[in-house]
A protein has these predicted regions:
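Short, hydrophobic/aromatic alpha-helical segments in well-folded domains
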Residues: 168-169, 188-189, 206
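Short helix-coil boundary/hinge micro-motifs
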Residues: 1-180, 228-247
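Basic DNA-binding region of bZIP-type proteins
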Residues: 211-226
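Cys/His-rich microdomains that often coordinate metals
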Residues: 188-193, 209, 214
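Cysteine-rich micro-motifs
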Residues: 200-211
Length: 247
C-alpha cells in the first residue's frame, strides 16, 4: 500500500541544496502542482517550503515569468511570500483530497459543491484582454495579422501567485477527463498524472524512477538463487494532510 503524504512538521524536510529538481511528469499543470510534494526516494520532499520556493516552482512550471517573479519579490514585505506559500500548500492539499476522491471516473455537476474554496480564489483574479504583438514563431507565419488578443493579469499583491495555480486546477476539473487521472503504481510513490497514452497503459510517474525500480524487483523475483540487496528504508506511514485554505 502506498505511503500517505505527512502533515507539515511531521517529517524533517530536506534542505533546498539537497533536494532533487521539482518533478513535472503529470502532463497537466494542475496535477504537477499536487506533485510539488512527494516521496521520490522514500523521503518526503517539499518543493514549496517557503516563498522563494513558490516563486521558483511557478517559474519552472511556466506559470509566471522571471519578470513577474522579480516584481513580486521586490514589492513583498518580509514574510509575506512565506505566508502565500503556506496558503498554496493548503490549497494544494484541499485539491488533492478532491482529486483522490474523484479520480478514475468522469466528473459530474455534483462535484461543484466541494469546489467552493477553489472558486473563491478564482474570483479574486484581475485578468483583462489586451492587443499585443504576435510572437515571431513558425506556426504564426501564415497569420493574417502581426497582432493577437491575449489575456493578461494584474499582479496586484503576492497573493496573486495563487491565481495561476487555481486556474490550472480549474482547467483540469473543467477540460480534462478525470477517468484518465492515475496514481503512480510505485509502492512508495504518491505522484499523480494524466494518462494521455493511446492505449491508456501508463503505470509510472517516470520509467527512470519507479518503472526502473519495478523492473529490478521483478528481476529479483525471477532470480531466487541470487542474494537480494538490502532494501532502502521507506518513510513511515503518516496521516494525509487535512489543511485548509482560508481565502
Amino acid at each position: 500500500m502506498k505511503e500517505d503524504i505527512p502533515k507539515d512538521g511531521e517529517h524533517k524536510l530536506q534542505v533546498p541544496d539537497t533536494r532533487p529538481p521539482a518533478m513535472f511528469i503529470a502532463d497537466d499543470p494542475g496535477l504537477d502542482f499536487l506533485n510539488s510534494i512527494g516521496t521520490p526516494a522514500g523521503t518526503v520532499i517539499e518543493w514549496l517550503a517557503n516563498g522563494e520556493d513558490l516563486l521558483a516552482w511557478l517559474e519552472q512550471a511556466k506559470l509566471i515569468d522571471s519578470a513577474i517573479a522579480a516584481a513580486i519579490r521586490a514589492n513583498s514585505f518580509p514574510g509575506e511570500l512565506d505566508e502565500v506559500a503556506a496558503q498554496a500548500r493548503s490549497l494544494r492539499e484541499r485539491f488533492r483530497e478532491f482529486v483522490l476522491t474523484h479520480m478514475g471516473r468522469p466528473l459530474t455537476a455534483k462535484a461543484l459543491d466541494v469546489l467552493e474554496a477553489l472558486n473563491r480564489v478564482l474570483e479574486r483574479d484581475e485578468q483583462y484582454p489586451a492587443i499585443v504583438a504576435r510572437p515571431d514563431l513558425p506556426r504564426h507565419r501564415h497569420a493574417r495579422s502581426g497582432l493577437e488578443l491575449r489575456s493578461l493579469r494584474r499582479w496586484s499583491t503576492p497573493n496573486s501567485l495563487l491565481l495561476p495555480l487555481a486556474q490550472a486546477m480549474a482547467h483540469l476539473v473543467c477540460y480534462e477527463d478525470f477517468s484518465l487521472v492515475k496514481g503512480c503504481e510505485g509502492k512508495a510513490c504518491v505522484l499523480l498524472f494524466l494518462d494521455r497514452t493511446h492505449a491508456r497503459v501508463r503505470r509510472w510517474c517516470s520509467m527512470s524512477i519507479c518503472g526502473n525500480r519495478a523492473k529490478q524487483a521483478a528481476h529479483r523475483k525471477r532470480s531466487p538463487g541470487k542474494p537480494e540487496s538490502k532494501p532502502l528504508k521507506r518513510a513511515k506511514r503518516a496521516a494525509p494532510i487535512n489543511s485548509r485554505i482560508s481565502p
